[in-house]
Amino acid sequence: WQRVQRWTVDSPSMQRPVEVQIMLPKDRKAPAPMLYLFDGISGTETSGWLKWGGLEKVFAEENVTIVMPTGASASLYSDWVRDDPALGRYKWETFVTKELAPLLERPEHGLNFNGKRGVAGLSMGAIGAVHMANAHPELFNAVMGLSGCYSTMDPIGRQIAKVMVESRGGNVENMWGPYGSDMWRYHDVVTHPEGLRNMRVYLFTADGTVTQAELDYQKTRPFYELAAGAVLEQGTHQCTVALDQAMRKAGMTHQMVEYKHGGVHSWDLFDRQLPTAWQAIKPSLM
């Protein structure tokens, strides 16, 4: 990957080094915004956006620094209340907002920063990105969520959070404590979306309907992926509608929300949507 560097950043909150992949802007001499781009549930050591998400193609001519923290598997990019025996110590919100951002913006590190930040993600990363933007509106100028779930208190959001954590051997109570605790409520953007009022917001979801495009993509993949992807995307559709409606109820109409008929939860879907999503938030970062 050209223009992609791997930085190792010491995290006091997580008490370990964290590897962060950074895609440099096309023109390193010109000031550029920083776009924090969060991964899906796997959270591997190489960002899925690079492996499967078409990132290099979309940003080949763009003047933006893309920041991809790695190794956040099943974390929801949040601060956990307890260390987890399977997953370890997770303090992702603190790491991104209090440790990583100030570090990257120091002039001596050579990233020419224009003062604007965006945060974005897909699936689990969308949950983390939209929460982080809502909780830290002073930090972000734009947020983008592809196929995420933004309530933690409703039945779908609660179940998605639980399934994500347990799928990697974690205990959901180590994340936010017992269901209904202050931390569960803190992460529920649908009940308090006020932090999104003064930033550009782009949300996208398909509806889980299987079309020919999905059948073609899944030809060489196991059938359960298609079935699970359909169910998941039906869920994220309901979740996205819920946030859109909550924002409207709070008097916000600036959000750009795209509902696509046809499409299941897969990298093929996210890859196809990334160019549109980026163009939607780009003006607020330049």
Predicted regions and their residues:
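Non-catalytic cap/lid and distal C-terminal segments of serine-dependent acyl enzymes
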Residues: W1-M286
